[in-house]
C-alpha cells in the first residue's frame, strides 16, 4: 500500500511544478511596460507605464548586478498620464564607468498598496544592448556668412567602448516653422561640426542635433539637443551696385601698371635720386683699414691690391720656348757592374794647350733618382743639370792632340770609394760627381789613419785621365790575382808616399797630352732658378 502511495505523491509534485513554471518565466520575461536605457557611463533611465488601473501611491525601481555587490533604487515620478520615470545613479560621478558589456542587471518595480509592498514587474536588463546617450550640448556658430554657416557641438558621458561607433543627425528649420517640416542631415561618422549652405541672407534659423551609438544595431537615438538660433548676414550692398566684378579687377590692374611706369620714369629722369638711394639702401660694411692698419698703409689703402695675389699672372705662363729634354735611360739591375764607371775610348776630344776647353756635354740622367727593388741605388747628389741638348765644339786653336790610335786609360774608383760616386749608365758624354770622396780603404794604406778629402769645387779642374799615378791609386782589388793581395797593398802605400799631392797637379800642367774635362759652370742651375725659368715643366 505504501508503494502505491509514493508514486501518486510524486506525480502530484511534478504536476504542481509544471503549473508553477510558466508563471515564473512570464514574470521574468514580461518587460513590455518597462523601458530602461543605459547612457554608457553611470546612469540607467527607466520609464514604466501600465494599462490596468492600480490603486498605488508610490512605486520604486530596484536594480541589482550579477557581478557587483550593490543595490540601487530610484523613485518613479509621474511624467504624464499613466507614465512614470526615474534615473538609477550607479556611480558617484557622472563620468565614471560603472558597467561593462558582461554585466546583467535584475530590475524590479515594486509599489506600495494598502497591505504593503508588492512586486509589480521583474525584468533582466543588458546595459550595452540598450544604449541611449545623453543629448549633445554646447552648440555654437563658428562662422556665418550670407548663405553659409558653420556649427559645432559637444557630447558628454560617452564610454570609450563606443566612441568609434558614434553617428549624428542634425535638423534645421526657419524660425517659426514646425520641426516636422525640417530637413534632416545625417553624419555617419564621428563629426562634431556641420557646414550649412544655400541659406537665405538676413534670415533666422534653428538647428538641433542628436547622437546614437551604432553598435550591434541595438542603439537608440538620444533626445534632440536644445535648439540653436542664428541669423545669416545681409547681402553685400556693393554687389548690388556693381554686379560686374570683373570691372573692379580691371581697374586694379590698370592702377598697378600706371604706378609701376610712374616709378620707372622718376628713377630715370631724376639723376640725383641714384646716390640718395645708394645711401639709403647701403648696408653698413666695416672699414678693414681700421683693423689692419699695417696692411692698409703698406698698399696705400688699396683694398683690391691688398687682396690680390702676390705673384703676377705672368709668373704662371712660360716666357720662352719649352726646353728639349733628353731621353731617360733606365738600366736593368744586372748592369750595376764596374762597366758603368768606364770611359769609352772616344769619349771626349783632347784639350788645347792654351787652356781653353770645349763645351761640356751634360744630360739629365742624374736628375732622376729611383729607389726601386731592382733599380740602381744612387746616392742623392745635390747637383742639377740643364735640359739643353748636348753640343760638342771642336777647339780650333793650336794645340796637340793624342793620336787617333792612342787608347784611353780606364778611370776606376777605389773599392772603398765606389759607393760614393753617383753611378750613371755609360755614355760618350758621361761626367762623374761625388759629394765627398771617402777615405781610402785600409787595404791600400795599411795602418795609416785615413784623411778626409774635401769635395771637388766646380771651378777646379778634374785630374788628368792619363795620369798613371792616379790610375795606380784607383786600380781595383778585384782585378789582381788572388795571391798578390799583400804586394798590391805595399805598392799602393809606397806610391802614395813617394808621390806628393802637388806633383800630381804639376805633372798635369807639364803634360799637355792627357784629356782634361773642364766643368761648364753656366750649366749648373739651382732648383729655384730652374723653376723660375720654366714653371710649367716642374718635376
UniProtKB/Swiss-Prot annotation:
The chain crosses the membrane at residues 241-268. Residues 135-235 form the Fibronectin type-III domain. It holds the Pfam family IL2RB_N1. SUPFAM superfamilies: Fibronectin type III (SSF49265). Residues 1-26 form the signal peptide. Residues 27-240 are extracellular. The WSXWS motif appears to be necessary for proper protein folding and thereby efficient intracellular transport and cell-surface receptor binding. Belongs to the type I cytokine receptor family. Type 4 subfamily. This is Interleukin-2 receptor subunit beta. It comes from Mus musculus (Mouse).
